Regions:
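Interdomain motor-coupling "hinge/lid" segment immediately C-terminal to the ATP-binding subdomain
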Residues: 1-106
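Conserved phosphate/pyrophosphate-binding and hydrolysis machinery centered on Walker-type P-loop NTPases
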Residues: 56-64, 83-87, 100, 114-118, ...
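A short acidic, leucine-rich amphipathic alpha-helix
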Residues: 108-112
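A cross-kingdom feature that marks ATP-driven nucleic-acid transaction machinery
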Residues: 126-127, 133, 138-265
């Protein structure tokens, strides 16, 4: 696992240091391998089962493979290597985070739910970040008093792992969490894309106390790009007027299932 490799390679290096991350396969890698139209046809499958190579190469056995990945990598490796004192709490934390993708996460609230103090929750989340299971997205705040400043959203690097944690593998049609799966997929894919393409800007979400929000922001070279995510191609949605007035020079776009390819290339 990534965390095991990290533990084994802590020796200091002289000179320049390069850091390499191996994520689940990206949209671009899969599209280049099997042609873009074919990959787009598999979008529903990716939202449920993710993009780990083991899953891609074992069609028909996705659930079994994901359960093995979760059991061996998340539970056994993490619990063994970090010597976690309350392993059952880490499992509950992962499940709580899986149910909250696309939502602001309060360490206090999560801790109260699973029986841990907020500091321990944060420590466990940092461990999960080091092992490339989840990552945090901070809130953006510059101009307005009513912008949320302290909360963070937490996303999984892979939708399949998220679904494995809560044993939720039903087909996309009829699911109540399509919006959350779509947001997690887009944000995680964009994160992988930006890393591989050496994008050195910052990423955020934006929300006010009145619950006006922007799903995803990127800030680079003095510019700001705002993105709203909607699953349905014909969904009508306007970027928050409050945001537009506060940041009038921002670029703004709606990303849906009919145009997402340009967002991930």
């Amino acid at each position: 696992s990534a965390f095991e490799l990290q533990n084994k390679t802590q020796e200091p290096l002289t000179g320049r240091k390069f850091e390499f991350h191996l994520f689940p396969l990206t949209y671009r890698e899969l599209a280049n391998h099997s042609q873009e139209l074919m990959e787009q046809r598999l979008l529903n499958h990716r939202l449920v089962f993710g993009s780990y190579p083991e899953v891609i190469n074992n069609q028909g056995n996705e659930i079994e493979v994901l359960k093995l990945l979760a059991d061996s990598f998340l539970y056994r490796d993490l619990l063994m290597l970090e010597n976690i004192k309350k392993p059952e709490k880490l499992v509950k934390l992962l499940q709580a985070l899986a149910y909250q993708i696309g939502q602001e996460v309060s360490y206090n609230e999560v801790g109260n739910t699973i029986g841990l103090d907020s500091k321990t929750v944060e420590t466990y989340i940092q461990l999960l970040e080091k092992s490339f299971v989840v990552f945090r997205l901070p809130s953006f705040s510059r101009n307005l008093r009513n912008e949320l400043k302290a909360l963070k959203k937490i996303y999984f690097y892979d939708n399949g792992i998220r679904n494995a944690l809560i044993a939720s593998f039903q087909l996309l049609e009829g699911r109540q969490d399509i919006g959350a799966l779509w947001e997690n997929y887009l944000v995680s894919e964009r994160r992988k894309k930006n890393f591989y393409q050496r994008f050195y800007g910052n990423s955020y979400f934006w929300r006010t106390k009145e619950k006006q929000e922007i799903d995803y922001l990127e800030e680079a070279d003095g510019g700001l790009k705002a993105y709203e995510f909607k699953w349905k191609e014909k969904a009508k949605h306007r970027i928050s007027k409050t945001f537009r007035n506060a940041y009038p020079n921002s670029e703004m776009a709606l990303i849906h299932s009919g145009n997402y390819d340009s967002f991930l290339h």
